[in-house]
Amino acid sequence: MKPLSSPLQQYWQTVVERLPEPLADESLSAQAKSVLTFSDFVQDSVIAHPEWLTELESQPPQADEWQHYSAWWQEALSNVSDEAGLMRELRLFRRRIMVRIAWAQTLALVTEESILLQLSHLAETLIVAARDWLYDACCREWGTPCNAQGEAQPLLILGMGKLGGGELNFSSDIDLIFAWPEHGCTQGGRRELDNAQFFTRMGQRLIKVLDQPTQDGFVYRVDMRLRPFGESGPLVLSFAALEDYYQEQGRDWERYAMVKARIMGDSEGVYANELRAMLRPFVFRRYIDFSVIQSLRNMKGMIAREVRRRGLTDNIKLGAGGIREIEFIVQVFQLIRGGREPSLQSRSLLPTLSAIAELHLLSENDAEQLRVAYLFLRRLENLLQSINDEQTQTLPSDELNRARLAWAMDFADWQQLTGALIGHMTNVRRVFNELIGDDESETQEESLSEQWRELWQDALQEDDTTPVLAHLSEDDRKQVLTLIADFRKELDKRTIGPRGRQVLDHLMPHLLRDVCTREDAAVTLSRITALLVGIVTRTTYLELLSEFPAALKHLISLCAASPMIASQLARYPLLLDELLDPNTLYQPTATDAYRDELRQYLLRVPEDDEEQQLEALRQFKQAQLLRIAAADIAGTLPVMKVSDHLTWLAEAMIDAVVQQAWVQMVARYGKPNHLNEREGRGFAVVGYGKLGGWELGYSSDLDLIFLHDCPMDAMTDGEREIDGRQFYLRLAQRIMHLFSTRTSSGILYEVDARLRPSGAAGMLVTSAEAFADYQKNEAWTWEHQALVRARVVYGDPQLTAHFDAVRREIMTLPREGKTLQTEVREMREKMRAHLGNKHRDRFDIKADEGGITDIEFITQYLVLRYAHEKPKLTRWSDNVRILELLAQNDIMEEQEAMALTRAYTTLRDELHHLALQELPGHVPEDCFTAEREQVRVSWQKWLVEE
């Protein structure tokens, strides 16, 4: 045995300090010192189980000891009485045997072929042991699964990949497929289960027993994604379902995977032979199958691009000339000629490589170089993984692990090891390139596009996605891969024609490239895939995004910035047309042009087609809302302007809705006859709250009341004559209907008409005289407060003037200051008790103390308190200009008015942005402390102090 190198002798002193007294004395053999210095995994294991080291020294590992694993397991099984005990013993047995394998491997006591065999046989022993124990337990619990003839049905397990080939890594996942022979039901249990239920439950428990980490670790990481339909498919399939899948839907990569498939355990039983015979025609075609060459060429191109992308010279699996390329070379011949040449049907690589040479498919020299390279790389891979029982194929960058590998591979130093490694990998790459021709040269753009195409088509192995998504955290990377997989599953449920598939396959690599290179890739992708699910069957929209890269770019940036926009686009894909022109997308309609724009838009729709009119109104509103939000996100609209645009848009919609309702009512009943001698409609819509105060948000509803000036004796002049006031009531009802009717484009606005005289108990529409009388004689103080933020948003000039006069008269009434202060304060306290402090350790921007509603109450109180002396205070209905008026009229100091204005606009701005993020209107308790303090000081000054 080669002595430890100088760096490892130094490290041995560190190891000694870790070892407990009995292990640290001079009695340790040179072999033990070498292995404990090389492998932290062995070191940790024998510290926890010193008896294992004694066993290793007295009974060193042998090449053929894998033949005893089953007997040794039977001894361990005597300690098992329940599932928890099974999990514990499996984990301890696996660790004990892995220590023995690591010992033999480090000291080169057995050949590398023996190491691979031992690792694979250990896994098979434990998989079969767990399956058999659980089968008995499940039969006791649910009865024995039987076919129609009453014959017991077993669970068969296909070991895939390196497990199937008897070439398992030291630290490796295991790829499994579960199957059972025939349908039927359980017999002998308390209640009957069909076989599918039985084996699915048993399969779930088997995965848990092997895969679930406990204080003793895990047995193996179990990967079931190679089964038919992958993660979306059943966990366990009947033979009939397997056969149907592979005959009808099996793909080339599944043939590639199935080459190594091996039945675990009793592989010579009747059912095992049946399964094997069923799968063979899928894997090995009877004829020489050159049809597979193109897909093999694609696989080769994938690997080559992966190498170019990252320069993976330090990855002995993925790198140019690495293990994967050797496996690929061998399987090329198996897939093309395996049906005609039984000697090529071996699951293991080295026997197949020998057969390839004997058939003169490769020269003896090339085959020998591949054999030597394979054994060299597999030994290096297993040594690397046995240092920490860690699943890695990347060569270390630290000096200690480099020294360990150089010593174990029998080289003087790291430089000598890497020199030999490069030689072997160069030989592999040469054969690899000669096999189906070198890659055609491709531009950087083509190469870049290809990696995203592979990500979209699920052609990358999980460890291959790192270069593409390297900038993302591990969690985000997993989330992105899950989102892509889930989206593909969703597509499988939809009827997408060949043209749609083609467009999608062209679009998705570009979309993934643009989304996944962002830091917020996972969030953005989740929003966009939700949108795409809604339009995948509508190829026109896919083509729009595919053929107009700028539209795709705008879609991504808007969805990244706002889930609200993403939701709107998902619900109403017609809006995607708005993405085509950035000049209009980020430039909302001029505030005074909304009415004209809407009028022009509605001219496209027949006036007598009510359904299309309703759709057109909603589509116009959504398109304008999108443009406002886009400009808000782009930073071209400050908060005040956002509300201005939203308010002007709402007024344009009110105008159009009243127009439609009026035309429909007049067509049915004629006009009220009091209008014959005058212009106008004798009708007004008053906006309260956010609409009245020019402060609408993205999801604000509309607070409206309806007024008319119809005399008591007026009648309509149509064929269906009705009372004039009844006409206006039906007009108001029609307006409410047009706003609230849900079409495929949703509703227009939520409308709240409860601020009308007598609230919900009052008439929906009120005469101007009755409104004035109510305000003067019946209205509460809070209704006068609401009037501060009220204005006519639609109406005849004379009705508008009448409302303005009533509003001014009410607001300028003399009021006793103390009484008003008490009433306003108590109303606010009631509201706060009802609405505020709902969220522990959060600040509700609108409802909590120091928030927006407090500012609104301060301005309303001051207008009602001082308008009698300063009538100019009644001019505006929005808080910002009211605060300006209070300063100009010497009610409030300018500094305080400006501070409250800043607080108000800051809080409003935050509400807008929370709405864009579809988040509720509350923030952490420590936010906006300065603004809230200013509001509290002003509240105390005006509404508490004498």
UniProtKB/Swiss-Prot annotation:
GO cellular component term, pick one: cytosol
EC number of this enzyme: 2.7.7.89, 2.7.7.42
Catalytic activity: [glutamine synthetase]-O(4)-(5'-adenylyl)-L-tyrosine + phosphate = [glutamine synthetase]-L-tyrosine + ADP; [glutamine synthetase]-L-tyrosine + ATP = [glutamine synthetase]-O(4)-(5'-adenylyl)-L-tyrosine + diphosphate
Record has Metal-binding as a keyword: no
Location of region: Adenylyl transferase: 449-946
Keyword annotations from UniProtKB, A to Z: ATP-binding, Magnesium, Multifunctional enzyme, Nucleotide-binding, Nucleotidyltransferase, Transferase
Chain intervals for the UniProt region annotation (Adenylyl removase): 1-440
Domain of life: Bacteria
GO molecular-function term, one example from the UniProt record: [glutamate-ammonia-ligase] adenylyltransferase activity
Cofactor(s) essential for the protein: Mg(2+)
SUPFAM superfamilies, A to Z: Nucleotidyltransferase (SSF81301), Nucleotidyltransferase substrate binding subunit/domain (SSF81593)
InterPro entries cross-referenced by the UniProt entry: GlnE (IPR023057), GlnE_rpt_dom (IPR005190), NT_sf (IPR043519), PII_UdlTrfase/GS_AdlTrfase (IPR013546)
Signal peptide: none
Pfam hit, one: GlnD_UR_UTase
Keyword Acyltransferase: no
Biological-process GO terms, alphabetical: regulation of glutamine family amino acid metabolic process
Family to which the UniProt record says this protein belongs: Belongs to the GlnE family.
Task performed by this protein: Involved in the regulation of glutamine synthetase GlnA, a key enzyme in the process to assimilate ammonia. When cellular nitrogen levels are high, the C-terminal adenylyl transferase (AT) inactivates GlnA by covalent transfer of an adenylyl group from ATP to specific tyrosine residue of GlnA, thus reducing its activity. Conversely, when nitrogen levels are low, the N-terminal adenylyl removase (AR) activates GlnA by removing the adenylyl group by phosphorolysis, increasing its activity.
Name of the protein: Bifunctional glutamine synthetase adenylyltransferase/adenylyl-removing enzyme
Natural source organism: Escherichia coli (strain SMS-3-5 / SECEC)
